[in-house]
From Swiss-Prot:
One of its GO terms (molecular function) is ATP hydrolysis activity. Residues 12-240, 240-503 form the ABC transporter domain. Induction: In the absence of AI-2, repressed by LsrR. Induced by AI-2, via release of the LsrR repressor. In the absence of glucose, induced by cAMP-CRP by direct binding to the upstream region of the lsr promoter. It is a peripheral membrane protein. This is Autoinducer 2 import ATP-binding protein LsrA. GO terms for cellular component: ATP-binding cassette (ABC) transporter complex, substrate-binding subunit-containing; membrane. GO terms for biological process: autoinducer AI-2 transmembrane transport; quorum sensing. Keywords: ATP-binding, Cell inner membrane, Cell membrane, Membrane, Nucleotide-binding, Repeat, Translocase, Transport. PROSITE patterns: ABC_TRANSPORTER_1, ABC_TRANSPORTER_2. Its EC number is 7.6.2.13.
């Protein structure tokens, strides 16, 4: 996507950057360059060092040694304010907005001459096709819209170096295309973009160059056109991976507790004409031992439905039947006791206590069930069981959840849900922002859970993920399910997209 072969001095040149945490080398002499008008994609497994490198460039974290050259000027260390002044803006994977401020206030926060910025903000909103009510509270937005607000904050600051950390993780294909169109306009003005993503098709579409990090080093770097997909995947995950959980992992993953066993195919969760905030007249059945996909565009009402099932939102009409009994009036805790468990979309704000220990987080739901009191030895043993089952990487049980990479945080959250002995497991965007390796681990895990006759409701914006994982698929459009479940050959990206966009005519698969 580079607009010209003639390039001036690099916008950014990181040289021999080292960083260590608690005696562990996180970055080992990294060299990284970004030119004007180019997209440089940065890939790597969870814990490879991508986020640490970007935080150093953005002035959030100091390097132990090394230099940053910004448009020809050398710096040993930056602060966030200085980085902003130099035109560097990091759009984080987990949006950092003020939930009690309006969308407009969040976008304009920290800017001078706010009145002069209003027209620019409106122009950006129009260019990206955003339909925000600027006076709404940021806390009311879903993850995809919060991500877009963060990107707008960066664009409002006339950033010359824009770092996008998984910017499309929760965006629909249409929203992604609008974003890419806007990024192309920025590239034409000489802006350079560091694009962190695990989606190889998107990277091939937008990136001029690719660098792959592994274990704190640059394992592979080159022009996108010269690197094969096999080269990239091999650089990210050099070890040969098993296609399914090992026998040992399956042994450690046997779900705890006296969970009622249902024969595969037994209806476990039934929704009858459910109406609530963001959805209406939703009916479906979820069976033991199946993975039921719930697809739809962002804003279709999927997360609102999931939160209502778990008791986090008020049900306005209809019935929720769990094992043949209505649970409409039960609290979240009572639903949890009956085996209804929810893995939320936003792991950092809703799923984990980032300042609590890993052992505490894994056992958090069972703490509540037994009176909140933690038992350290038992919790540590539980964490060790899931470490072996899920291949979670950490140093000690007492370390805070925030110290883990995104993929390992997600595995801790999954372990937390499994420890509650689910009969029904609702997973909302379970692979958002995790790398290829961790994504495969999670897929294997969900299949293993379903094989134990747990009923799994998989909510995902990744239609290829839905196609790969789901036994049946319902598609929500503007808060409703207007079609019967897709099955077998009907489960494909094209058909799902058609229904998601409200196409009343879908092609039935021929027998």
């Amino acid at each position: 996507m580079q607009t010209s072969d003639t390039r001036a001095l690099p916008l950014l040149c990181a040289r021999s950057v080292y960083k260590q945490y608690s005696g562990v080398n996180v970055l080992k002499g990294i060299d990284f360059t970004l030119h004007q008008g180019e997209v440089h994609a940065l890939l790597g497994g969870n814990g490879a060092g991508k986020s640490t490198l970007m935080k150093i460039i953005a002035g959030i974290t100091p390097a132990d040694s090394g230099t940053l050259e910004i448009e020809g000027n050398n710096y040993v260390r930056l602060t966030p304010v200085h980085a902003h002044q130099l035109g560097i803006y990091l759009v984080p994977q987990e949006p950092l907005l003020f939930p009690s401020l309006s969308i407009k206030e969040n976008i304009l926060f920290g800017l001078a001459k706010k009145q002069l910025s209003m027209q620019k903000m409106k122009n950006l909103l129009a260019a990206l096709g955003c339909q925000f009510d600027l006076h709404s509270l940021a806390g009311s937005l879903d993850v995809a819209d919060r991500q877009m607000v963060e990107i707008l904050r960066g664009l409002m600051r006339d950033s010359r170096i824009l770092i996008l950390d998984e910017p499309t993780a929760s965006l629909t294909p249409a929203e992604t295309e609008r974003l890419f169109s806007r990024l192309q306009e920025l590239l034409a003005t000489g802006v350079g973009i560091v694009f962190i993503s695990h989606k190889l098709p998107e990277i091939r579409q937008i990136a001029d160059r690719i660098s792959v990090m592994r274990d704190g080093t640059i394992a592979l770097s080159g022009k996108t056109s010269e690197l094969s997909t096999d080269d990239i995947i091999q650089a990210i995950t050099p070890a040969v991976r098993e296609k399914s959980l090992s026998a040992s992992q399956k042994l450690w993953l046997e779900l705890p507790g006296n969970r009622p066993q249902h024969a595969a195919g037994t209806p476990v969760l039934t929704l009858e004409n459910l109406t609530g905030e963001g959805f209406r007249n939703v009916s479906l059945t979820l069976n033991a031992g199946e993975i039921l996909g719930l697809a739809g565009l962002v804003g279709a009402g999927r997360t609102e439905l999931a939160e209502t099932l778990y008791g986090l939102r008020t049900l306005r009409g209809g019935r929720i039947m769990l094992n043949g009994k209505e649970i409409n009036k039960l609290s979240t805790g009572e639903r949890l006791l009956r085996g209804l468990v929810y893995l939320p979309e936003d792991r950092q704000s809703s799923g984990l206590n980032l300042d609590a220990s890993l052992a505490w987080n894994v056992c958090a739901l069972t703490h509540n069930l037994r009176g909140f009191w933690a038992k350290t030895a038992k919790d540590n043993a539980t964490l060790e069981r899931y470490r072996r089952a899920l291949n979670i990487k950490f140093n000690q049980p007492e370390q805070a959840a925030r110290t883990l990479s995104g993929g390992n945080q997600q595995k801790i959250l999954i372990a937390k849900c499994l420890e509650a002995s689910p009969q029904v497991l609702i997973v909302d965007e379970p692979t958002r922002g995790v790398d290829v390796s961790a994504r495969n681990d999670i897929y294997q895990l969900l299949r293993s859970i379903a094989a134990q006759n747990v009923a799994v409701l998989l909510i995902s914006s990744d239609l290829e993920e839905i196609e790969l994982m789901a036994d049946r698929v319902y598609v929500m459009h503007q808060g409703e399910i207007t079609h019967s479940a897709l099955t077998e050959r009907d489960i494909n990206v094209e058909t799902i997209m058609r229904v998601a966009f409200g196409d009343s005519q879908r092609q039935e698969a021929s027998c």
